[in-house]
């Protein structure tokens, strides 16, 4: 059996209000969840406090982004210190929407990772290729470059989860086949073994994101190098509980 604790993160993105998120949280709190799975919900920054007050202690809270310094004249940004102050213990960094909609580069993402970890926040670090990159046969090159920019900024890997999300499968309804996902996860683990250490390669959780649903989660969860999921749209629905229990 894998010594790695299964990890399921829900990324609510820019969705919900107090009413709908409150209802979702009630559903999650009363749902039966596999105790061997680590569960984290990524709320919009403005609702972090609200979510932490309502979520059961068994469910951790994540921010969806943060900046690379603790405070200052950075209008519209939030810092890991603020995230911690709201009771959140994780942050999602390098999500494909941050990279491709907001133009964040590998270097900036690396700096954010370093600062969040230095403040004691866990990082869900996202990597993944676009459709044209997969079709050009450069998936590994792209994903390894993104991973290197993150790895160069990590001293303690115990607080890092790597999330592989093929960009072409996010919100498109296209899912990588379990075999396609496993292939990239396996190569990522080999990259970590070669470039970081064998110990980290065996312990780091590499989770999959990209149109994960109640219907696709079990077969994906059965792959040896898939240690969980980062779930988008389905994390706003009751089926999120099915996904949490994919390993059950």
From Swiss-Prot:
InterPro entries: Aldolase_TIM, TIM_sf, TrioseP_Isoase_bac/euk, Triosephosphate_isomerase, Triosephosphate_isomerase_AS. Keywords: Cytoplasm, Gluconeogenesis, Glycolysis, Isomerase, Lyase. It is found in: Cytoplasm. Pathway: Carbohydrate degradation; glycolysis; D-glyceraldehyde 3-phosphate from glycerone phosphate: step 1/1; Carbohydrate biosynthesis; gluconeogenesis. SUPFAM superfamilies: Triosephosphate isomerase (TIM). One of its GO terms (biological process) is glycolytic process. It comes from the Eukaryota. Its EC number is 5.3.1.1, 4.2.3.3. The active site is at 95 (electrophile), 165 (proton acceptor). Pfam families: TIM (PF00121). Substrate binds at residues 11, 13. Triosephosphate isomerase is an extremely efficient metabolic enzyme that catalyzes the interconversion between dihydroxyacetone phosphate (DHAP) and D-glyceraldehyde-3-phosphate (G3P) in glycolysis and gluconeogenesis. It is also responsible for the non-negligible production of methylglyoxal a reactive cytotoxic side-product that modifies and can alter proteins, DNA and lipids. This is Triosephosphate isomerase. It comes from Xenopus laevis. The lineage of its organism: Eukaryota, Metazoa, Chordata, Craniata, Vertebrata.
């Amino acid at each position: 059996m894998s010594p790695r604790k299964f990890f399921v993160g829900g990324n609510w993105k820019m969705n919900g209000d107090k009413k709908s998120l409150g209802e979702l949280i009630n559903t999650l709190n009363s749902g039966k969840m596999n105790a061997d799975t680590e569960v984290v919900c990524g709320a919009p920054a403005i609702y972090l406090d609200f979510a932490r007050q309502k979520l059961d202690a068994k469910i951790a809270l994540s921010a969806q982004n943060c900046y690379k310094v603790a405070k200052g004249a950075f209008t519209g940004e939030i810092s890991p210190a603020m995230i911690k102050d709201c009771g959140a213990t994780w942050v999602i960094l390098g999500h494909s929407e941050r990279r491709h909609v907001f133009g964040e580069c590998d270097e900036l993402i690396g700096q954010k990772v370093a600062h969040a970890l230095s403040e004691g926040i866990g990082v869900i670090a996202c990597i993944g290729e676009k459709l044209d990159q997969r079709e050009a046969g450069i998936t590994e090159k792209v994903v390894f470059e993104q991973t290197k920019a993150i790895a160069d900024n990590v001293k303690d890997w115990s607080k890092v989860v790597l999330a592989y999300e093929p960009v072409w499968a996010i919100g498109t309804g296209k899912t990588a086949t379990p075999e396609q996902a496993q292939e990239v996860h396996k190569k990522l683990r080999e990259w970590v073994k070669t470039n970081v250490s064998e110990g980290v390669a065996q312990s780091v959780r590499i989770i999959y994101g990209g149109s994960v649903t109640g219907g696709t989660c079990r077969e994906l969860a059965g792959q040896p190098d898939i240690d969980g999921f980062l779930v988008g749209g389905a994390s706003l629905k009751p089926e999120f509980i099915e996904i949490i229990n994919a390993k059950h």
